[in-house]
């Protein structure tokens, strides 16, 4: 169709049609039927006006040959085909000089003989249907409507056809020829069926009374009325305007808008250096759970009781020793801390009544691990105003780290299914309205796809740990409280299960401000040997604490059980967000919902059921070096959820900066893909802003690597 349009129509008409489509963000190469329709409409408008003049006596005459002596005025003013600003300027000028009523929409022509605006319609459907649509849209007695069809029919307001028979016959013959040409190339059926009802972007709402006065008062300086401002905005050419403004600013400022082409962007530079290390507040794929099914013990639901019950399920404890030391820490202190936990748990079991909470003895190893008395003394600023060389203490620049494969493995693992159910469907009342029914249906489908997902386990684990830590921080500010890391789930068969991942010991927690830090030591069970990826565990001291019997294809095998110990810290604001990690479910559900909405608007019906139940369809999940990865709708749900969860687990200023700055580049690339011919200035500065966020954070480095894959495939 595109080739046909370029052969069939005058190049000037083709160029005008392309410009009009680009103005509304449409691509002539994709929306070829619309391209053909716009060209046809333009040609009819030009043919309507051709050869019609008004002579010196004010009579309408037809002159087909150029007579240089004739002082003739064109009978019709052509409005269609001009850019919007110019078109409205012409309309305003006509209204001012002739006293004609200003139309709400841009008409196509103005007839100086009959003194009226004309709206031309070209339809592939019944002329009377199209005429009614036009009349309904325009709602104006003053604008004359004239409709032509490809079958030779026409219809005009009050059967007043404006032009002589011969001029109209020329237009009808041309339309019939276009139809024949299309049909001979097999294009007519698609073109005929593609016509939609009357649509408009050009509606001009009349603002009157108080709103009008408020509008006139709230204009930027130098604009006297709303109309002037509208005309200015309609004709605003951003590129030249920005260059002009910048050139006024300063001689040093030099911003030339450069075209952004497929060859323009380069990959984002990732830093070199030692591989990045794990920095989450708790273990993810490497975590090991000690679990009890159908818990019914005394005090079930009290964390300490649950923890002791879980600990009793394991019989392979052995004398612990360090297998991977922490480079900068005093490793014997980590070892002693674990031994102290075991001993104090044993003490509890020997008591007659197990207490609800356990405060650890303030031993030297725990004081060291929790940074007790390590904080520099705070001095009131007023007391040191007179000190001449007062300055903030020096802090080292963070060391650059390179991307490591473990973070991609962590993400892949987070997208996988586990054999447990981590979220229950909340009991919500009966649906009342149809929209509630659709919402419930979407929520149920989505929940079914993500309830077994490992990312959902991380959410529940994060919510539990942060809630417990914040509670303890407020309730036992001076105590080194022992906090079990617990989660609850259901097995496939629906049996309840309580899991213990390890323990946290919190330090002193007089948290006045949101950002005040509480230190804690985490001790987490794992079957992962830290010596396989020592760089991942840089911040940990790892002990071997037991041997676990595991069922495998060859029978029972014994595997060493490790304890990952590290000092960490968090704040009230971080714990508050950690407690709200369930929001990740909502965020990813909304992303899925927007995909369903897009599909539904195309099909003009709710597509929720088809969307989730059509298992054969695949959807884009993300970019990898291999290209665009695709998967089932369930995989899409779980991937979006995992991204949201990792944004929460690995939240950092580096991530905030990278997300904000890389988004700008992403928008420019998408504009290029949509053929919007974007321009940029100081692209180097944007790359600098993106790359200064790539320091050492594993999740940010992985996102940057994904962004590079996207660039590669988007610009092919």
Curated annotation (Swiss-Prot):
Binding site for Mn(2+) 2: 80, 108
Post-translational modification: Phosphorylated on serines and threonines by host kinases, including human casein kinase II.
MF annotations from Gene Ontology: endonuclease activity; metal ion binding; RNA binding
Gene3D superfamilies (alphabetical): Influenza RNA-dependent RNA polymerase subunit PA, endonuclease domain
Residue window of motif Nuclear localization signal 2 (NLS2): 184-247
Keywords annotated in UniProt: Cap snatching, Endonuclease, Eukaryotic host gene expression shutoff by virus, Eukaryotic host transcription shutoff by virus, Host cytoplasm, Host gene expression shutoff by virus, Host nucleus, Host-virus interaction, Hydrolase, Inhibition of host RNA polymerase II by virus, Manganese, Metal-binding, Nuclease, Phosphoprotein
Alphabetical list of Pfam families matching this protein: Flu_PA
Annotated GO biological process: cap snatching; DNA-templated transcription; symbiont-mediated suppression of host gene expression; symbiont-mediated suppression of host mRNA transcription via inhibition of RNA polymerase II activity; viral RNA genome replication; viral translational frameshifting
Keyword Iron-sulfur part of the UniProt annotation: no
Primary enzyme class: hydrolase
Cofactor note: Binds 2 manganese ions per subunit.
Record's keyword annotation contains NAD: no
Segments carrying motif Nuclear localization signal 1 (NLS1): 124-139
The EC number(s) this enzyme carries: 3.1.-.-
Tree of life domain: Viruses
Cofactor: Mn(2+)
Cellular compartments per GO CC: host cell cytoplasm; host cell nucleus
Binding site for Mn(2+) 1: 41, 108, 119-120
Protein location: Host cytoplasm; Host nucleus
Subunit structure: Influenza RNA polymerase is composed of three subunits: PB1, PB2 and PA. Interacts (via C-terminus) with PB1 (via N-terminus).
Family recorded in the similarity comment: Belongs to the influenza viruses PA family.
Function: Plays an essential role in viral RNA transcription and replication by forming the heterotrimeric polymerase complex together with PB1 and PB2 subunits. The complex transcribes viral mRNAs by using a unique mechanism called cap-snatching. It consists in the hijacking and cleavage of host capped pre-mRNAs. These short capped RNAs are then used as primers for viral mRNAs. The PB2 subunit is responsible for the binding of the 5' cap of cellular pre-mRNAs which are subsequently cleaved after 10-13 nucleotides by the PA subunit that carries the endonuclease activity.
Protein name: Polymerase acidic protein
Source organism per UniProt: Influenza A virus (strain A/Japan/305/1957 H2N2)
Gene name of this polypeptide: PA
């Amino acid at each position: 169709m595109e080739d046909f349009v370029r052969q069939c129509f005058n190049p000037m008409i083709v160029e005008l049609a392309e410009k009009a489509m680009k103005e509304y963000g449409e691509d002539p190469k994709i929306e070829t039927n619309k391209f053909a329709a716009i060209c046809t409409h333009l040609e009819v408008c030009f043919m309507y006006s051709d050869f019609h003049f008004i002579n010196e006596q004010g009579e309408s005459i037809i002159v087909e040959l150029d007579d240089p002596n004739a002082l003739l005025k064109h009978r019709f003013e052509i409005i269609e085909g001009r850019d919007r600003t110019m078109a409205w300027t012409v309309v305003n000028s006509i209204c001012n000089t002739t006293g004609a009523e200003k139309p709400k929409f841009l008409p196509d022509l103005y007839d100086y003989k009959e003194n009226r605006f004309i709206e031309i319609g070209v339809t592939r459907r019944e002329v009377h249907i199209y005429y009614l649509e036009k009349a309904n849209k325009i709602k104006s007695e003053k604008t004359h409507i004239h409709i032509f069809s490809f079958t030779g029919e026409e219809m005009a307001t009050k059967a007043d056809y404006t032009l002589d028979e011969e001029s109209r016959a020329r237009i009808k013959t041309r339309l019939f020829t276009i139809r024949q040409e299309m049909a001979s190339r097999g294009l007519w059926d698609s073109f005929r069926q593609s016509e939609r009802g009357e649509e408009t972007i050009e509606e001009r709402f009349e603002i009157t009374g108080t709103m009008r006065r408020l509008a006139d008062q709230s204009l930027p300086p130098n604009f006297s009325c709303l109309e002037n401002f509208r005309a200015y905005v309609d004709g605003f050419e951003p590129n030249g305007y920005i260059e002009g403004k910048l050139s006024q600013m300063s001689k040093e400022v030099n911003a030339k808008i450069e075209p952004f082409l497929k060859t323009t962007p380069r990959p984002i530079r990732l830093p070199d250096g030692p591989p990045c290390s794990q920095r989450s507040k708790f273990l993810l794929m490497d975590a090991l759970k000690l679990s009890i099914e159908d818990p019914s013990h005394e005090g079930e639901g009290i964390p300490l009781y649950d923890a002791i019950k879980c600990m009793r399920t394991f019989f392979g404890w052995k004398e612990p020793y360090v297998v991977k030391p922490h480079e900068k820490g005093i490793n014997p202190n980590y070892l002693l801390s674990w031994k102290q936990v075991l001993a104090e748990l044993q003490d509890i079991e020997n008591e007659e009544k197990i207490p609800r909470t356990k405060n650890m003895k303030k031993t030297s190893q725990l004081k060291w691990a929790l940074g007790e008395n390590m904080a520099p003394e705070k001095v009131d600023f007023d007391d040191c105003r007179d000190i001449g060389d007062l300055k903030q203490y020096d802090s080292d620049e963070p060391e650059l780290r390179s991307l490591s494969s473990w973070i991609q493995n962590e993400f892949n693992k987070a997208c996988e299914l586990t054999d447990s159910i981590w979220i229950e469907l909340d009991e919500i009342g009966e649906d009342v309205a149809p929209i509630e029914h659709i919402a419930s249906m979407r929520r149920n489908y989505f929940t079914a796809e993500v309830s077994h997902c490992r990312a959902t386990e991380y959410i529940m684990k994060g919510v539990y740990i942060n809630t417990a830590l914040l509670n303890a921080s407020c309730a036992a500010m001076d105590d080194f409280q022992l906090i079990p890391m617990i989660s609850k789930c259901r097995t496939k068969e629906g049996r309840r299960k309580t899991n213990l991942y390890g323990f946290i010991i919190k330090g002193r927690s007089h948290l006045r401000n949101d950002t005040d830090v509480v230190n804690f030591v985490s001790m987490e069970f794992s079957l992962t040997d830290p010596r396989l990826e020592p760089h991942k565990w840089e911040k940990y001291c790892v002990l071997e604490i037991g041997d676990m019997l595991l069922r495998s294809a060859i029978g029972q095998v014994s595997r060493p059980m490790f304890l990952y110990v590290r000092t960490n810290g968090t704040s009230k604001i971080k714990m508050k967000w950690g407690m709200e990690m369930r929001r990740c479910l909502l965020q990813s559900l909304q992303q899925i919902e927007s995909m369903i909405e897009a599909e539904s608007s195309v099909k003009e019906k709710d597509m929720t059921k088809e969307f989730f139940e059509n298992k054969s369809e695949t959807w884009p999940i993300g970019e990898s070096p291999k290209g665009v990865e695709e998967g089932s709708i369930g995989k899409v749900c779980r991937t979006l959820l995992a991204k949201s969860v990792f944004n929460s687990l690995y939240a950092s200023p580096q991530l905030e900066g990278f997300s904000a700055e890389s988004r700008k580049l992403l928008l420019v690339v998408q504009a290029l893909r949509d053929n919007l011919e974007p321009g940029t200035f100081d692209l180097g500065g944007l790359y600098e802003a993106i790359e200064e966020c790539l320091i050492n954070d594993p999740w940010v480095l992985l996102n940057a690597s994904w962004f590079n894959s996207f660039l590669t495939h988007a610009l092919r």
